[in-house]
Amino acid sequence: MTNIRKTHPLLKIVNSSFIDLPAPSSLSSWWNFGSLLGVCLAVQILTGLFLAMHYTSDTATAFNSVTHICRDVNYGWVLRYLHANGASMFFICLYLHVGRGLYYGSYTYSETWNVGILLLFAVMATAFMGYVLPWGQMSFWGATVITNLLSAIPYIGTDLVQWIWGGFSVDKATLTRFFAFHFLLPFVVTALVMVHLLFLHETGSNNPTGIPSDSDMIPFHPYYTIKDILGFLMMLTALSTLVLFSPDLLGDPDNYTPANPLSTPPHIKPEWYFLFAYAILRSIPNKLGGVLALVLSILILAIVPMLHMSKQRSMMFRPLSQCLFWLLVAVLFTLTWIGGQPVEHPYIIIGQMASVLYFLIILVFMPLISIVENRLLNW
């Protein structure tokens, strides 16, 4: 008799996606981050659901409701810190996942890549709105500064900002709508994940060599399920350690002060995972120019497939491109550090140099070095 997993209308979808799925035999641990992101999303939706049961999206009570969750709700502090640090884990996995795609040339699957970019924007929007909800000082001022950037859009900017705020400043209407969207967006992200997987399974996975692996495939289960479970355990161990030993390591102390529109914090900055983009924004003295650079710092991923000049797909056998890739990683770390520093000498000039280098590496150096490598191999 045929196995039920191969005949049942629902189970056969699961079977063809996670059990009998043909996968390249050479996938390294860099291919674990897709499944880790799935676990992160599940953790965020579950903890967020329970937090939403106790949270109130009103400026008068939001800060106190978060305090109430931490002090009075059974294991509320675990939920709150799992959710806050889970976001950090989410972004660590996201950036490593995108980095893997850049290194191994996975961006040549353009549909999967473009849906991935949409996912990145959706997750960033969700995280930004979530940061506003505790209604601490950094929540309030972060929301004010970042939403105010839209006023740089010519003609409609000011009206657009007031429309998003629901008034003439960040207030109760803003908090309520941010909570509504923060609750809704993870489900949009989940739907996009399904589209992402649908496109991926149309083409099959890439592999470290970048060479078609149709002749050497193995079933996803048990080989990659067991490998993914090891990844889950390692990530959840790291997350638990962070939550139980130093839950505020990645947060901002200013957010333990209730929001006060009359007192500006000495240094307004977003969460650590947005600092690289924030540094690029600040490095341009013009407001509209800064906003464009901020958007382009992520949107540049969409034109990476067009800039692929190499005859090889992966960077595995391209040492010159590898050097440039790791230089790009170093530049991103530098930008993250600069984004957390005050706007003063020498941080301003370092930020400007790193921002220029970031765009130069992706737009100019990578394509040029690929052409050089082709010539060296007489291609």
UniProtKB/Swiss-Prot annotation:
<feature type="binding site">
    <location>
        <position position="201"/>
    </location>
    <ligand>
        <name>a ubiquinone</name>
    </ligand>
</feature>
<feature type="transmembrane region" description="Helical">
    <location>
        <begin position="226"/>
        <end position="246"/>
    </location>
</feature>
<dbReference type="GO" id="GO:0046872">
    <property type="term" value="F:metal ion binding"/>
</dbReference>
<keyword id="KW-0496">Mitochondrion</keyword>
<keyword id="KW-0479">Metal-binding</keyword>
<comment type="similarity">
    <text>Belongs to the cytochrome b family.</text>
</comment>
<keyword id="KW-0830">Ubiquinone</keyword>
<feature type="binding site" description="axial binding residue">
    <location>
        <position position="97"/>
    </location>
    <ligand>
        <name>heme b b566</name>
    </ligand>
</feature>
<dbReference type="InterPro" id="IPR005798">
    <property type="entry name" value="Cyt_b/b6_C"/>
</dbReference>
<dbReference type="InterPro" id="IPR048260">
    <property type="entry name" value="Cytochrome_b_C_euk/bac"/>
</dbReference>
<protein>
    <recommendedName>
        <fullName>Cytochrome b</fullName>
    </recommendedName>
</protein>
<feature type="binding site" description="axial binding residue">
    <location>
        <position position="196"/>
    </location>
    <ligand>
        <name>heme b b566</name>
    </ligand>
</feature>
<dbReference type="Pfam" id="PF00032">
    <property type="entry name" value="Cytochrom_B_C"/>
</dbReference>
<feature type="transmembrane region" description="Helical">
    <location>
        <begin position="77"/>
        <end position="98"/>
    </location>
</feature>
<feature type="transmembrane region" description="Helical">
    <location>
        <begin position="320"/>
        <end position="340"/>
    </location>
</feature>
<comment type="function">
    <text>Component of the ubiquinol-cytochrome c reductase complex (complex III or cytochrome b-c1 complex) that is part of the mitochondrial respiratory chain. The b-c1 complex mediates electron transfer from ubiquinol to cytochrome c. Contributes to the generation of a proton gradient across the mitochondrial membrane that is then used for ATP synthesis.</text>
</comment>
<feature type="binding site" description="axial binding residue">
    <location>
        <position position="182"/>
    </location>
    <ligand>
        <name>heme b b562</name>
    </ligand>
</feature>
<keyword id="KW-0472">Membrane</keyword>
<keyword id="KW-1133">Transmembrane helix</keyword>
<keyword id="KW-0349">Heme</keyword>
<comment type="subunit">
    <text>The cytochrome bc1 complex contains 11 subunits: 3 respiratory subunits (MT-CYB, CYC1 and UQCRFS1), 2 core proteins (UQCRC1 and UQCRC2) and 6 low-molecular weight proteins (UQCRH/QCR6, UQCRB/QCR7, UQCRQ/QCR8, UQCR10/QCR9, UQCR11/QCR10 and a cleavage product of UQCRFS1). This cytochrome bc1 complex then forms a dimer.</text>
</comment>
<dbReference type="InterPro" id="IPR036150">
    <property type="entry name" value="Cyt_b/b6_C_sf"/>
</dbReference>
<dbReference type="GO" id="GO:0045275">
    <property type="term" value="C:respiratory chain complex III"/>
</dbReference>
<keyword id="KW-0813">Transport</keyword>
<feature type="transmembrane region" description="Helical">
    <location>
        <begin position="33"/>
        <end position="53"/>
    </location>
</feature>
<feature type="transmembrane region" description="Helical">
    <location>
        <begin position="347"/>
        <end position="367"/>
    </location>
</feature>
<dbReference type="InterPro" id="IPR027387">
    <property type="entry name" value="Cytb/b6-like_sf"/>
</dbReference>
<dbReference type="InterPro" id="IPR030689">
    <property type="entry name" value="Cytochrome_b"/>
</dbReference>
<keyword id="KW-0999">Mitochondrion inner membrane</keyword>
<keyword id="KW-0249">Electron transport</keyword>
<dbReference type="GO" id="GO:0006122">
    <property type="term" value="P:mitochondrial electron transport, ubiquinol to cytochrome c"/>
</dbReference>
<dbReference type="InterPro" id="IPR005797">
    <property type="entry name" value="Cyt_b/b6_N"/>
</dbReference>
<feature type="transmembrane region" description="Helical">
    <location>
        <begin position="178"/>
        <end position="198"/>
    </location>
</feature>
<keyword id="KW-0679">Respiratory chain</keyword>
<dbReference type="Pfam" id="PF00033">
    <property type="entry name" value="Cytochrome_B"/>
</dbReference>
<feature type="transmembrane region" description="Helical">
    <location>
        <begin position="288"/>
        <end position="308"/>
    </location>
</feature>
<feature type="transmembrane region" description="Helical">
    <location>
        <begin position="113"/>
        <end position="133"/>
    </location>
</feature>
<feature type="binding site" description="axial binding residue">
    <location>
        <position position="83"/>
    </location>
    <ligand>
        <name>heme b b562</name>
    </ligand>
</feature>
<dbReference type="InterPro" id="IPR016174">
    <property type="entry name" value="Di-haem_cyt_TM"/>
</dbReference>
<dbReference type="GO" id="GO:0005743">
    <property type="term" value="C:mitochondrial inner membrane"/>
</dbReference>
<keyword id="KW-0812">Transmembrane</keyword>
<dbReference type="InterPro" id="IPR048259">
    <property type="entry name" value="Cytochrome_b_N_euk/bac"/>
</dbReference>
